[in-house]
């Protein structure tokens, strides 16, 4: 329905290491590239974050060099659990919202930082009322609720801006 589409929030990708491990410098694209070369393992999921990461490594010219240390796991929980339990200098990749949630639950991971803006992958969450909806008023109410400052505060607390 025209005029009902709205941005609810954006999720960005971040890098984690095991809690207590040295934090690599990923403050720029070149620093990020070097951190990936220095890592003993790069752990990502098989979903969109992992697909993006593999393509990013290729784009940075280090896909071939790093391919043997890229470990793809089924989901972000498995990625973060692996990094938390890894004695090696492993770097994990995931959505900031998921990283925040798992760290809050006590998983022994430390957020290094979001990916640098120049190489960041942003997932946008939108809401809209579809024309085929039989409950358009309820859908409009939900979209208004999700766009309200109170909902935005909840999103922000979970890493979605």
Language-model features: where?
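Exported/periplasmic ABC-transporter solute-binding proteins
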Residues: 1-161
